Structure formats: structure tokens, C-alpha cells
């Protein structure tokens, strides 16, 4: 069974991607920050696709400690990863002044640039492992 992580998969394009891959029999893991919305999205995908292999980890992509913890939890649970889809984004035009994170990064930059880079770096080993057995392309 192929495995995918999708950030921001509880709504929009991420949700539709998760649903389509679940329909194809993939094991889908969502990395999202809102627990209730993510639980509802997972349950809805499971029901609509009859695929029980839809799960999630809570992660705040603007917090690099949270990103690292989510990856550690995933690695403890799974031995392989075929695809990482960095879908989540922070794009709020109503914010007039920068929001600085605990990591001393501007929040949108942390979420949209640093977190995808960190996720890709931390999960590279699993992706390469899948590549060796012909399941992923890194």
C-alpha cells in the first residue's frame, strides 16, 4: 500500500487530494493543526472511500518544534513514505504587521517556506527508502 502525507489536508485542494488518493487505496496521513476539523475530514474520507487507512497528526507548521514532533510520531508509526505533499499555506492579507513565531521567524515565511523544507529534509530518508524499492521518486 502506498503512503502519503498531506499538509493542510482537512479542507480545499488538500482534502480533495486526500480523498482521491484514499479512493485509490493509499494510506493517507494528514498533517494539520485544527483537531476537530481534521478528525471530521478523516472520518468523512473514511466513510466516502471505505478506506480505513486515513489518519492524522496534529502539527502547527509555523512552529518547527511541532513539525519535528509530528515527523517523529510518523516515523515511530510508519516505516515508509511514498509521497509528501506540502499543501498547507498561510496567506492572510488582513494582517497588517508581521507575526513573529517562537522560532523568531515571520509566521507566513515559517509556514510556507521553512516548514515544507524541514518536512522534506526530515522525511527524506523514508522517501529514499521507498525509492530504493521502486515506490517513490525523490
Q: Which role does the model predict for each range below?
A:
Residues 3-6, 84-85:
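Conserved hydrophobic beta-strands of the Rossmann-like cofactor-binding core
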Residues 8-12:
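Conserved glycine-rich cofactor-binding loop
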Residues 24-40:
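Conserved glycine-rich Rossmann-like NAD(P)H-binding loop of the short-chain dehydrogenase/reductase
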Residues 35, 57-69:
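The beta1-alpha1 cofactor-binding region of Rossmann-like NAD(H)/NADP(H)-dependent oxidoreductases
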Residues 87-93:
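Conserved NAD(P)H cofactor-binding loop of Rossmann-fold oxidoreductase domains
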Residues 94-110:
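Short alpha-helical oligomerization interface
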Residues 113-114:
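Ankyrin-repeat alpha-helix packing hotspot
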Residues 133-138:
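Conserved small/polar residues in nucleotide/adenosyl-binding loops
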Amino acid at each position: 500500500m502506498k503512503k502519503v502525507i498531506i499538509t493542510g489536508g482537512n479542507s480545499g485542494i488538500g482534502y480533495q487530494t486526500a480523498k482521491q488518493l484514499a479512493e485509490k487505496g493509499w494510506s493517507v496521513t494528514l498533517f494539520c493543526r485544527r483537531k476537530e476539523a481534521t478528525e471530521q475530514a478523516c472520518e468523512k474520507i473514511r466513510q466516502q472511500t471505505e478506506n480505513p487507512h486515513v489518519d492524522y497528526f496534529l502539527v502547527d507548521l509555523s512552529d518547527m518544534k511541532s513539525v519535528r514532533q509530528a515527523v517523529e510520531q510518523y516515523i515511530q508509526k510508519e516505516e515508509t513514505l511514498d509521497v509528501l505533499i506540502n499543501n498547507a499555506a498561510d496567506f492572510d492579507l488582513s494582517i497588517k504587521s508581521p507575526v513573529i513565531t517562537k522560532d523568531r521567524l515571520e509566521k507566513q515565511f515559517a509556514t510556507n517556506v521553512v516548514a515544507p523544507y524541514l518536512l522534506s529534509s526530515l522525511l527524506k530518508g523514508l522517501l529514499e527508502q521507498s525509492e530504493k524499492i521502486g515506490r517513490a521518486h525523490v
